[in-house]
Amino acid sequence: TNQAIREDQRGFNVIATPGYPELISNMINLNTDRNNTAFVVGDTPLRLEGTSTAIQNWANNSSSALDNGEDGLVSSSDYLGVFYPSGLTTDNSGKSIVVPASHMMMRTLANNDNIAFPWFAPSGTRRGIVDNATAVGYIDSKEGEFETISVTESVRDSMHEVKINPITFFSGAGIVNFGNLTK
């Protein structure tokens, strides 16, 4: 039930609603009700373009959105990490599908906890390797197709300013989460 998930005996330390950035505030509220016992993995919109301007406008809620979602991010929490961009992977039948950043990060967090302690950042080429996606990018809003991108250093720098964690490709390492910021 809605109340049962808030009980102390429910043991979890990570929460996410993959593909639903509009539920970030609900996850923050749930975590607050549980005395901040979890890390909230937040998604950016699947259609958010990979430019510094688009990412910063969304993260700063430049469109004055009233709630989290396609138009902007309104929530913040010391327990919230927001990640960008989305990923490309395959489903069980081998077809390519687009997945939100939280899909990649939940696995990366679990892998990190297997090789290090949970308080170590799941970031960088040692503990931040993303092994459940083949590319990163976004869905082009005009064509409806996945657009593969490389999150360049300048875009990563602008993401850092607004506390959005970049997932990018590095030669010799593959796809890597390269951030450990909370919003």
Identify the residue ranges that each predicted region occupies.
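A glycine- and small-residue-enriched flexible loop/hinge signal that marks low-structured segments
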Residues: 1-183
